[in-house]
Amino acid sequence: MHQRHTVSRPVSRPISNEALPTAFDVAVVGGGVVGCAVLRELSRYGLKLLLLEKEPDLAEGISKGNSGVIHAGFNVPSGTLKAKTNVDGLSRVYKLARELGVPHRKTGKLVVAVDASDRPRLEELKAQGDRNGTPGLEIVDESAIRALAPNVRGRWALSSPHTGIISPYEFTFALADCALGNGARILCGTPLTSVEARPDGYLLGTPRGSFATRWVVNCAGLDADEVAALAGIADYKIYAYRGEYLIADREAGEVLGIPVYPVPPRDDSFLGVHLTPTLHGNVLLGPSSAYVEDKRDAATTRAMTDRLKAEAFELVPALRRFPFIHAYAGLRPKLTDPQGKIKLADFIVEESRLRPRWVNLVGIESPGLTAAPSLAAMVADIIGAREDIALRPDFVAERPAVPKFADGDDAGRA
């Protein structure tokens, strides 16, 4: 019988009673939601799989510093890979969340025009969403806004009923857990330090030894350009883009049960400071948007805290009466540059021309969380087009939900 392994947090060692092999069919570099989605997707096939993550835990980068929104796909430009994988990923994320027991909720979402002059922009967003295949979009008036979100101030809004919220790190862990249960190996605290190209694949150097692999899938997020450079691929430059957040106390969930966004600028560079309820009852304010030189610069500032509050209170004045308990920042991997020379950049998913059987996923920013399962399917297609891979009859798709201490009764906590 296929053995299942259930983890409530990521692992820093291989989960197996056997010694770790040194040869694999596919090595995934990066243990965020995209890397773990790729690992889980490839575990459906008869492949020996390894994931390398440089941090002590999974989901330590982009995957923990975001809004946790399941996007419906109307905010991304039509005809792009972002749009295609977002809309395709929408149903995939909900399906995976059910199969893997991941907390999530289909909340709907409102993009709110405080001023009537912003209605044309809502019409543009709806038309873009219709082209992209986003389901159920509708422009609603003040009375409908009050019915959906009584505490939101606005004249008009674009309603997206299929938008939702999910715990991004729990989703990442669940994908990894499913892959582990289907035979994949994961090494956390194991950065990739060297790459040697060989006729039959690659030799990957790490502090824990070297691993031979026929394929490499680069899902390293902010470091994807540097990981590619280790293999001599100098095609990419990633810029770090910091977004600061504020977290309102759990009582704030009483006044907002649906994500609320302002009308975004026409260049689609930024969605604006939005308000997002969490599955735990808190409300997130943010993110802000600023390029930073250091890819690890996740600092928060008082000036931005004040700005986040001011913009949030314009949409939901009732939030003024709740305390804010924490601030944090997340970083996004931008392919557009701070100088504005590159105006628009799409997701990149491609096999390297220089290094056969090396697949790069670069610039996977928002809506990367929603797009992750679709991006993973693309990787499987790239590998499947080059060699014969067969689905495993013993693949275990489902995972029981992991019990949470906070959800138990007194006896269960004792």
Question: Model segments located where?
Answer:
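N-terminal Rossmann-like FAD-binding beta1-loop-alpha1 element of flavoenzymes
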Residues: F24-L51
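Glycine-rich FAD pyrophosphate-binding loop
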Residues: S43-G65
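Flavin-dependent oxidoreductases
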Residues: A37, V195-G286, Y291-A299, A310, ...
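C-terminal catalytic lobe of FAD-dependent flavoproteins
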Residues: F270, L279-H280, Y291, K295-G408
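Helical element adjacent to the flavin cofactor pocket in flavoenzyme catalytic cores
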Residues: L158-W215
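Dinucleotide-binding Rossmann-like beta1-alpha1 core, especially the glycine-rich loop
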Residues: G68-A144, L148, G154, F270-V273
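Short beta-strand to alpha-helix junction loop
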Residues: S78-D88, V112-R121, S159-D177, L187, ...
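Extreme N-terminal leader/targeting segments of oxidoreductases
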Residues: M1-V26, R44
